[in-house]
Amino acid sequence: MPTVSPTPIRRAMVLAAGLGQRMRPITDNLPKPLVAIGGKPMLDHALDRLAEAGVEEAVVNVHHLAAQIEAHVAARTSPRVTISDERALLLETGGGVKKALPLLGSDPFFHVNSDSLWSETGCSNMSAMADAWDATSMDMLLLLARREGSVGFDGRGDFVRADDGLLTRRGSAERAPYVYAGVAIMKPELFADTPEGPFSLNLLFDRAIASGRLRGIVLEGQWLHVGTPDAIAPADAAFAAAAEVHA
């Protein structure tokens, strides 16, 4: 993988439209992206890290309690935020991006789940992704977390990673060493011939795997899976511990 990105990644799609059902009752009145971890709403963690990586414009989709998110990001300038409104129909992780493509332009962009959290170790993982991006060999680059050692995650893992970063699915294996950490860089061309309406990003993962063009880099730091109210305290503790180490 290259060490310098020939084309900086300047735009991002941030997914903030989900219902947050597993986070209830908190999300009955507060959208999940605005739940605070480490003293800051999860959405702000995502946007701040995008800004640190050089992203200038972010498209944020909204559905559940949309007005709260719109008001929260209204004054942001780094990155500048444009809203993609999904109040009428929640379009999932793939369909929401397809709707927003006219706002994202023709260049590769970051795709970020607004609840993607990790404690950094002094380096910017998103900057590392931008540096690793190689449009000649990749259609999509994923940020991966080590399944073992992640906070709040008890799943079987998603991907196996070769030495050159090439990714394959877990398949029939009992476990895989890496989990998708909720951040990707992707080409807009991937969305050609995709369904109208809701669909999952998994469709594009599988397309990129089939063409041998899905790669991943491993997150430096500790990934925090904040899916339920019970996961908030461990995530807060992980942020506090990281802050002490790097103070």
Where do the protein language model's features map onto the residues?
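Cofactor-binding loop segments of dinucleotide-utilizing enzymes, especially the Rossmann-like FAD-
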Residues: A17, H63, S114, A145-R146, ...
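A generic "binding-loop/recognition-motif" signal
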Residues: L19, L30, L65, R87, ...
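Conserved catalytic-core motifs of eukaryotic protein kinase domains, centered on the activation segment
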Residues: P25-D28
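A generic structural signal for alpha->beta connector loops
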Residues: P31, V55, S78-R80, S137, ...
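Conserved N-terminal catalytic core of the sugar/cofactor nucleotidyltransferase
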Residues: M1-V14, R22, A36, K40-N113, ...
